[in-house]
Regions:
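A short acidic, helix-capping loop that chelates divalent metal ions and anchors anionic groups
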Residues: 39-44, 77-82, 116-123, 187-188, ...
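A short, acidic, flexible beta-alpha connecting loop/helix-capping segment that sits on the rim
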Residues: 10, 249-266
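N-terminal pre-domain/capping segments
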Residues: 1-103, 135, 173, 212, ...
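Active-site groove signature of glycoside hydrolases
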Residues: 102-121, 144-152, 249
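Active-site-proximal loop/turn and secondary-structure-junction residues that shape catalytic pockets
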Residues: 9-11, 35-39, 74-77, 114-118, ...
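Conserved beta-strand positions in the central sheet of alpha/beta enzyme cores
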Residues: 32, 70-72, 111, 149, ...
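Acidic/histidine-rich catalytic cores of soluble enzymes
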Residues: 2, 31, 37, 125, ...
Length: 282
């Protein structure tokens, strides 16, 4: 497995070249970029990013030998499962845009977030809408040939790994699978069990750590990697058994305000290295 970090973990004021330099120097093997709202940060992609801008980012990636491993986004909201067709169309356009950027930057996958459950949209309807939103552009996804990872987030959509498996299996595509977020299930479950059940469906992995107050469903807080309730040896073992050999992408924030950006990146890279090395301790 290799070490990656999401660009959200880098201070918003840092430009693309400075970010690539710092992340590489810290010891990472790759980076995940994000499509955000206009001017969200000095290193965000936007829906309006030009070919010239993407070409410049690709040059930086090659200059620092730091591959762009995936394209995430903050723009999904509840669009994919919305009752409004125009919102679902917006979600489809975003997926296609992510795939286009991934193709230009050499990334091997993108992250998408199905959902839409609300007071006005039942879970069943949000699920049906989300499936249709993705299914209707499945041909485009397969033509581009880049992995689309469905992520588990705190939106009450995937409450068990079986929910996630069934959703992915119904889409029935070699290019659609799980973007599994280890930390997002810790409040109510154990990530190693999700990994065992999702198995080979997992194509991308986000890592962060969550400290339970007192067992599951007791609340808690986000903490530094290796400081929470995740049983990392079991997680790494489960990933290994599932055949996962890709990037572990840290999606984390500084918990120490006195820490510099360089210190933070170096710390996270070291934590990831320790996690990956747990393969040999099992």
């Amino acid at each position: 497995m290799k070490k990656s970090i999401n660009a959200w973990s880098v201070d918003k004021s840092i430009c693309f070249e400075d970010m690539f330099c710092r992340v590489k120097t810290a010891g990472f093997d790759g980076i995940e970029l994000n499509i955000d709202s206009e001017d969200n940060s000095a290193h965000s992609l936007a829906l309006s990013s030009s070919k010239k801008q993407l070409d410049e980012i690709k040059i930086l990636s090659e200059k620092y030998n730091l591959p762009v491993v995936s394209i995430s986004t903050s723009l999904f909201g509840s669009n994919m499962g919305s009752a409004q067709q125009h919102e679902r169309k917006t979600a489809q356009s975003l997926i296609i845009k992510q795939l286009e950027y991934a193709e230009k930057l050499g990334a091997t996958g993108i992250l998408i977030v199905p959902g839409g459950l609300s007071e006005n949209v039942s879970l069943q309807k949000a699920r049906e809408n989300s499936l249709k939103t993705i299914s209707d552009i499945k041909t485009e996804i397969e033509d581009i040939g880049i992995f689309v990872g469905v992520e588990n987030v705190w939106n009450r959509f995937f409450m068990s790994p079986y929910d996630m498996c069934r959703f992915i299996d119904e889409l029935d595509s070699a290019y659609i699978g799980a973007y599994f977020d280890v930390g997002n299930v810790v409040e109510f479950s154990d990530p190693e069990n999700w990994i065992e059940i999702l198995g080979g469906r997992i194509g991308k992995v986000h890592v962060k750590d969550f400290k339970r107050r007192n067992g599951v469903y007791s609340g808690g807080e986000w903490v530094d990697l290796l400081s929470g309730s995740v049983n990392w040896p079991k997680v790494v073992s489960a990933l290994k058994i599932a055949g996962f050999t890709g990037y572990l992408t840290a999606e984390v924030e500084k918990t120490n305000p006195l820490q510099t950006q360089n210190e933070f990146c170096t710390m996270v890279a070291s934590e990831l290295e320790n996690i990956i090395c747990m393969e040999d301790e099992i």
